[in-house]
Design a protein with these regions (language model features):
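Structured secondary-structure scaffolds
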Residues: 1-25
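Catalytic adenosine-cofactor/nucleotide-binding cores of aminoacyl-tRNA synthetases and other
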Residues: 14, 24-181
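C-terminal accessory/binding modules appended to enzymatic or scaffolding proteins
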Residues: 182-201
């Protein structure tokens, strides 16, 4: 069947013997079986579909970068020396089943956000804009051509106050939206000089 490895949660151990018998009966070559600890919630409960942000699309919707999520999941129950950040090539090079711990890992949203913040702050503005543009087109409103350059020029400081692409989108509304709402306190801070700067922008 050209299957070399079956890697799954340790709750499937009980199925393994029966499945091995099927392979042997069919005279197929047995794959390597690996049963790894389950991922739990921060409360120590088994992760389920009913939990908030349990699918990849859930994380995409809140602006989690795929590389950041991959890096976080890679380090969830696995380690390589004291290294924390892995690009895709390094992930493939260093990952091995022997490095996986025996205890269940906890899916911690605060750590996911921290990892995502690291990626946002360290990615170059061109790639970050492409990610933001894709995110906005998929989940928000598309960045129009006349706003694109202003967004690009602003990313160097927008990314320093962001943990997600959602944060960047929200903090760049003064560029993306044609209408900016000010409350009474905001208006008190806007003098003639401020109005001139805003209008020129």
């Amino acid at each position: 069947m050209n299957i070399t490895h079956i890697i799954r949660g340790d709750d499937h151990k009980i199925n393994t013997f029966k499945q091995m018998q099927i392979y042997l009966a069919m005279k197929w070559e047995l794959p390597s079986f690996a049963h790894i600890p389950l991922i739990h919630t921060v409360d120590g409960k088994k992760l389920s579909k009913r939990d908030k942000a349990s699918t990849l699309d859930d994380y995409s919707k809140i602006g989690i970068i795929s590389d950041a999520l991959r890096n976080y999941l890679l380090r969830l129950g696995w380690s390589f020396k004291d290294k924390e950040i892995f690009n895709l090539d390094e992930s493939i090079k260093y990952f091995n089943l022997e490095g996986i711990g025996k205890s269940p890992s906890k899916l911690d949203m605060s750590r996911i956000l921290s990892m995502n913040e690291h990626y946002i702050k360290n990615i170059d503005e061109i790639n970050l804009y492409n990610l933001l543009n894709e995110y906005c087109a998929g989940y928000k409103i598309e960045i129009t051509a006349d706003k694109a350059q202003k967004i690009k020029n602003s990313l160097s400081f927008l990314k320093n106050k962001a943990k997600t692409l959602e944060d960047i989108y929200r903090n760049s509304q003064y560029i993306i939206s044609d209408k900016v709402n000010f409350n009474d306190d905001d208006l008190k801070l806007i003098d003639k000089t401020s109005k001139k700067i805003i209008s020129e922008f």
